[in-house]
Amino acid sequence: MLNRENKTAITRKGMVSNRLNKFSIRKYTVGTASILVGTTLIFGLGNQEAKAAESTNKELNEATTSASDNQSSDKVDMQQLNQEDNTKNDNQKEMVSSQGNETTSNGNKLIEKESVQSTTGNKVEVSTAKSDEQASPKSTNEDLNTKQTISNQEALQPDLQENKSVVNVQPTNEENKKVDAKTESTTLNVKSDAIKSNDETLVDNNSNSNNENNADIILPKSTAPKRLNTRMRIAAVQPSSTEAKNVNDLITSNTTLTVVDADKNNKIVPAQDYLSLKSQITVDDKVKSGDYFTIKYSDTVQVYGLNPEDIKNIGDIKDPNNGETIATAKHDTANNLITYTFTDYVDRFNSVQMGINYSIYMDADTIPVSKNDVEFNVTIGNTTTKTTANIQYPDYVVNEKNSIGSAFTETVSHVGNKENPGYYKQTIYVNPSENSLTNAKLKVQAYHSSYPNNIGQINKDVTDIKIYQVPKGYTLNKGYDVNTKELTDVTNQYLQKITYGDNNSAVIDFGNADSAYVVMVNTKFQYTNSESPTLVQMATLSSTGNKSVSTGNALGFTNNQSGGAGQEVYKIGNYVWEDTNKNGVQELGEKGVGNVTVTVFDNNTNTKVGEAVTKEDGSYLIPNLPNGDYRVEFSNLPKGYEVTPSKQGNNEELDSNGLSSVITVNGKDNLSADLGIYKPKYNLGDYVWEDTNKNGIQDQDEKGISGVTVTLKDENGNVLKTVTTDADGKYKFTDLDNGNYKVEFTTPEGYTPTTVTSGSDIEKDSNGLTTTGVINGADNMTLDSGFYKTPKYNLGNYVWEDTNKDGKQDSTEKGISGVTVTLKNENGEVLQTTKTDKDGKYQFTGLENGTYKVEFETPSGYTPTQVGSGTDEGIDSNGTSTTGVIKDKDNDTIDSGFYKPTYNLGDYVWEDTNKNGVQDKDEKGISGVTVTLKDENDKVLKTVTTDENGKYQFTDLNNGTYKVEFETPSGYTPTSVTSGNDTEKDSNGLTTTGVIKDADNMTLDSGFYKTPKYSLGDYVWYDSNKDGKQDSTEKGIKDVKVTLLNEKGEVIGTTKTDENGKYCFDNLDSGKYKVIFEKPAGLTQTGTNTTEDDKDADGGEVDVTITDHDDFTLDNGYYEEETSDSDSDSDSDSDSDRDSDSDSDSDSDSDSDSDSDSDSDSDSDSDRDSDSDSDSDSDSDSDSDSDSDSDSDSDSDSDSDSDSDSDSDSDSDSDSDSDSDSDSDSDSDSDSDSDSDSDSDSDSDSDSDSDSDSDSDSDSDSDSDSDSDSDSDSDSDSDSDSDSDSDSDSDSDSDSDSDSDSDSDSDSDSDSDSDSDSDSDAGKHTPVKPMSTTKDHHNKAKALPETGNENSGSNNATLFGGLFAALGSLLLFGRRKKQNK
């Protein structure tokens, strides 16, 4: 910080003397409550500007997080700036913040980091091995009353070194002039910001006068120059080499490369800390103009910071005494190389030495993350210097799920340039932790109340914001060196979501975000011509449900320096200065005096050998003097000045020689001829002290009070000067004329003035707050003022959770943190606000006697406990608002207790035996029922089970809305919901909502009744008349197997009918079931669904639905099949049918009349061939054939009329067919059809029907004697027939007939089995057996749809069956023909 009155640098220790010609602005960490930017201006020797050491305030090292969503955790870094003059760019290096914000209760605290270079040794040295080294000027603390124009301004006096002269003869005056033109240098080259005063001296700071970035520097007259002690040897000017040559081997250097932990926190961070490069370089005299040497640095090093234009800061090396350029710099940043090319300076001077002192930086691009043992190296000439460091980046600022980090990554500032003030870039990492955030918003603001001179700005006219999405799992560079090619540019997605606001801010609405983002803010500086502008920019991330978090960055300035000098010979000179303290010694802050005449005489001849007039800075130089003794005389002193004492101290270069003195030149320059003069002035002041015993007298052990403001006024009350007391309580007003003055002391905070004019010693007493001082030809150092500390006390104690609600602090009860406590005065004005710490403690400090009001804010979810319980006010609760009195001691009795109110929710689960949905007196609870409690978002909170009485309860619940779910107990059904008007007696169902509002809720009940069970069953009877109805004379069939399947087809029960044909399945729930009756051996399924549901047959498989009642309607009937021989004849007919022959055969069938009908059927047979469609017709025919036929037809139905053919063969036959059907009951489906039956044939097999066919053996039927033969055949026939049946499918009718003949054969079941094979054939044409029906929930039978059944029977069986069938047909056909005749 620049103290503009005294122009002194303020460090953490207070005032320091001006020490280093180096311009720097230091970096500070900024707190959340207030931000101070401290800047220290120091001017450097060389024209090179070293960037500021990157440092953060270690004292402010912890991110502050707030307790509410509208408060944020701020973290701001003060990044160092390198401010240039009005036409130059600022050199800035960013500082990533350590995590720190700190606020103090007694105002804004500024803590300054150490300067990058802070010793008096940072200057160019010129020396040879033969030199008589001159002592450098002594640095002493400036008198605090001295007003300075430049802070930290060192008396500019380089070390002067000796060189032997090349020429030993005394030069002529003309020669002297020539040498002067070449070698005289009386100005200083200082590269820094331009600072102007009323008196200005122009100093060239760069050899390239056309470079607008290297503007001239104007130093005020008050700046003391370096003593021009440089002793140079004039070299014969030699032509420079025609060819540039690398002279690294002719350069020797003594180099140190040091890692500087700027904030001394033992953590090295590229953006905070830096490298100090110091080197003393000696140039061999063989080096010529145009030769060059190099400085090579490793890829972990960078030579400039944030400002790309700052590369010039490590630039040309100049002689600070005369401004001449020694070597010019050229940068090759791509190869990390600086090339220095020598000018003709090295041709004209011997033994050139150069010193460089640079601050260089760690390159975050090559150090993206924390890493140990990172190497940094610099090679000057052929000498490499190395060092290593453990790099440790700071963490991001995190608060709950919010996380953020930021840094300035580029700044170009043109101070004083209205048209192009420059720009800066800030890089912000949003949500680097990659948490899922809701309603995430980023606010960027170039404003902070503690920085009224902030030159940052954000608005839509000058600001460009880029937004990049970071891939999941991507590692961001912790030095904020971002490779955007590896990220996704999503700027266009957010163009409409960026809102610019007042006060230089912009808000970006990210919405719901679960990835990290990089936001780059590129904006312009505001115009400024301030010598110490500040740049502060904040970034705050907020999201729903999380506390906001903030970070920020700020900047400061500094310079690098370099320089060199050759050595020249034989000059006399130095300096005339104003010795303000009249001690005869040159000291810092004492300025030169111009226009004083200096005349030099040869002391032996009294001949005048030179004359000069001091320049504005007080310097002079008279060159080209040979060895000898010379008399130096000063004249033409400014009016009113007197000569200071001579020969003071032991340093001839700093003392005064008086108006006339004799000095000797002996093989080297003599630059010690100085003169000190002063204008008589007087001082007024003394001391401000702490009067600890309050007696009004300065006692020996009482100490001064620093920082007290003292104001000097003239007799008319006009303010002349204002100072503050130093660390010892001293103050002084200087440069005062004789007269009367008024002195006023400002009472320091926390103090009270002591008594006035106690005792008789005016130098020891207190003059009070206002006094008069007189100066009369002498200093007046008697004006003192004493103060004693105003007594201060504390008030506070404790906020605790009163778990037992008794209003008293128990030993097991703990404090509540984060409770806001407010202190007010008696008038109700807020004095202080604080929050309880982690232990519930709070305290207000620094309070005077008085009455105060203390208010406690009730923490969320708590209720204040009872007040004033018991007699011990140290442990009771004072409530949420109370009064506290301080009377000469602390008051630590003001406490407040709170408790968390919690409630219960629950009631009862009961068995509602009467199912009325209301708890009746005699109904009991159900134990073991699982009850689940959920919050409004369906998150399970607790689960309990009802106790032995059906009771349940959830405890320790806060106010809110909850969901309660009851699990239906096994064997029960939920009762009706919300019956009646009594909410405490009704059932709330399986799921209900319960609200707790400052009371228990014990109304959530649920009722269940036992789930009823049902029975299913009825009767299996012998349907002797085959009419499909249960007649009173028909009896049940015993031991019929009945199987019960559930809806999934799983067997859940098996039983057998009792001796009366009855069966029953019990304990069934409502639902869908299937009942399967196993057909008794030798019986045939009777017709189904022929009459009322409780009297008919339901078939072999029945689907049934039980809905809240028993079902005793599931019956089934069977009968025994009859046989007929003549049928076999008809079979033969059927043969002819089979021929499908010609219907004429079927005509012959017509003999058997109806057969003829059936013939026609048979015709249809042929149709049947075309397809069993006609068979279906034939069915009807078959019907016509005979009822019994029709039975078989019903078989044949499925069978496609082939049956009907067979029917047509003979009605009875068709019966027999039905026999055979029964065999191939399939036949019953028109036999072979039934062969599809054959599947059922397998029935028929089981029928062994064939046995009954063996009836058909009775086929002996003579009908076909041959039949009977065929019977034996029939066996095979049966097979083959059946097979043929299947063949005959189209014919199958007649086949099936023949089958039916041979059916009996098919009796050989096994054949029939083979039938079933053929059946499979037949199956292709025949319908599935009609034994399965479906019942709806009304218990009405529904016919099942017909489906084909394909069997894998033997093809050979089919073939043989076909052949036998054909043979049988021919025989029968021939026989019938004979009969017809």
From Swiss-Prot:
According to the record, the signal peptide region is 1-35
Q: Which Pfam families match?
A: Big_8, Gram_pos_anchor, SdrD_B, SdrG_C_C, YSIRK_signal
Keyword Secreted included in the entry's annotation: yes
Q: Domain CNA-B spans what residues?
A: 569-680, 681-791, 792-901, 902-1012, 1013-1123
Q: Identify the stretch(es) annotated as Disordered.
A: 54-185, 857-883, 972-992, 1078-1357
Domain of life, per UniProt, equals Bacteria
GO annotations under biological process? cell adhesion
What keywords were assigned to this record? Calcium, Cell wall, Peptidoglycan-anchor, Repeat, Secreted, Signal
Q: Where is this region: Ligand binding A region?
A: 36-568
- Here the segments flagged for biased composition (Acidic residues) are 1091-1101, 1118-1134, 1142-1164, 1172-1320
Q: Which residues form the propeptide?
A: 1348-1381
Main localization is: secreted
Where along the chain is composition biased (Polar residues)? 62-71, 94-108, 146-155, 163-173, 860-869, 972-981
Question: Which residue ranges does the UniProt annotation give for the motif LPXTG sorting signal?
Answer: 1344-1348
Matching entries from PROSITE patterns are given as:
GRAM_POS_ANCHORING
Q: Where does this protein reside within or beyond the cell?
A: Secreted, Cell wall
Short sequence motif named YSIRK-G/S signaling motif, residue ranges: 23-34
Q: Where are the transmembrane segments?
A: none
Q: What's in the GO CC field? A: extracellular region
Key word Cell inner membrane present in the record? no
UniProt feature, compositional bias: Basic and acidic residues: 130-145, 174-183
Q: What does this protein do?
A: Cell surface-associated calcium-binding protein which plays an important role in adhesion and pathogenesis. Mediates interactions with components of the extracellular matrix such as host DSG1 to promote bacterial adhesion to host cells. Contributes to the resistance to killing by innate immune components such as neutrophils present in blood and thus attenuates bacterial clearance.
PANTHER family referenced in this protein's UniProt entry, alphabetically: COLOSSIN-B-RELATED
The subunit field of the Swiss-Prot or TrEMBL record says: Interacts with host DSG1; this interaction increases S.aureus adherence to keratinocytes.
In which family does this protein belong, per the annotation?
A: Belongs to the serine-aspartate repeat-containing protein (SDr) family.
**Record protein name field:** Serine-aspartate repeat-containing protein D
Which organism is this protein's natural source? Answer: Staphylococcus aureus (strain USA300)
